[in-house]
């Protein structure tokens, strides 16, 4: 379920070596999934934008004029597509919008993100700077230039009314990367992909990743590996037992590794911020 990229594989300077531990991707991705039923995810948005290069993320329509995505999907020249299933065909259901304003969560560490995106670094600097780094609050609201028309293929997804439970059955969707093979990193699916897995305890993710896993995050995936979101899926929805609960945020690289589930923003904790931001800027 990935699309172009906002992918971060942390490469080191000098010899071109990489960290001895797993690389980090600040973008979730879809591995081990299947083609979603057409328009079964009518709230799904595809975002294309620029930030040094062309990039892609997912998003969620939470209001007729607002899309929720990940803060690390920040960029310029956004194009938002809704009602899309197959990127390779002209679909009459597609609505295209531009973004008139963007509102990343004020507590998201954009300085740390920019450092991660812009630097080639030696091993010592990498671990000193990013071991235990906190990428909480990875949310951003995008105001569209005009409201979209709600149809069978374009629908608003309701915010959660209660927290998810560990053990819930969840799925995530997107056009992000579908291969764990980095030689195929630019081979992205034309059709919207879905993958299903389980909501795990945060302790399981805390032991699996070098970034900090906080109470503002959700841990989801298969401990056996092989099923995951991937590069290009970031910002897309995590739906657990039929309820919108998370936004795809980050995970290990390559995607879908055994013992390394993905990390999602816990949307329930941000309902007030989402509602207040929309009310203040509509």
UniProtKB/Swiss-Prot annotation:
Glycosylated residues in this chain: 100, 109, 122
Gene Ontology biological process terms from the UniProt entry: regulation of systemic arterial blood pressure; zymogen activation
Propiece residue ranges: 18-29
InterPro entries the UniProt entry points to: Peptidase_S1_PA, Peptidase_S1_PA_chymotrypsin, Peptidase_S1A, Trypsin_dom, TRYPSIN_HIS, TRYPSIN_SER
Localization in the cell: Secreted
pH dependence comment: Optimum pH is 9.0.
Name the record gives this protein: Blarina toxin
């Amino acid at each position: 379920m990935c699309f172009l990229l906002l992918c971060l594989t942390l490469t080191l300077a000098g010899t071109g070596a990489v960290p001895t531990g797993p690389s980090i991707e600040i973008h979730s991705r879809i591995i081990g999934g299947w083609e979603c039923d057409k328009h079964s995810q009518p709230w799904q948005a595809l975002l294309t934008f620029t930030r040094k290069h062309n990039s892609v993320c997912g998003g969620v329509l939470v209001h007729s004029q607002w899309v929720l995505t990940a803060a690390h999907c920040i960029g310029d020249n956004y194009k938002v597509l809704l009602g899309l299933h197959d990127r390779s065909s002209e679909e009459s259901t597609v609505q295209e919008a531009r973004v008139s304003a963007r509102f990343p969560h004020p507590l998201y560490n954009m300085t740390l993100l920019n450092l991660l995106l812009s630097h080639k670094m030696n091993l010592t600097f990498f671990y000193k700077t990013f071991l235990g780094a906190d990428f909480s609050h990875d949310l951003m609201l995008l105001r569209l230039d005009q409201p979209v028309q709600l149809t069978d293929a374009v629908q608003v997804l309701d915010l959660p009314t209660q927290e998810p439970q560990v053990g819930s059955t969840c799925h995530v969707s997107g056009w992000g990367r579908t291969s764990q093979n980095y030689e195929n990193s630019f081979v992205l699916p034309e059709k919207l992909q879905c993958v299903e897995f389980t909501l795990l305890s945060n302790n399981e993710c805390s032991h699996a990743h070098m970034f900090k896993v906080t109470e503002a995050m959700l841990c989801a995936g298969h401990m056996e590996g092989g099923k995951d979101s991937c590069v290009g899926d970031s910002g897309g929805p995590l739906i657990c037992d039929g309820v919108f609960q998370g936004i795809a945020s980050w995970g290990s690289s390559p995607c879908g590794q055994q013992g390394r589930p993905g990390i999602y923003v816990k949307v329930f904790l941000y309902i007030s911020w989402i509602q207040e931001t929309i009310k203040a800027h509509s």
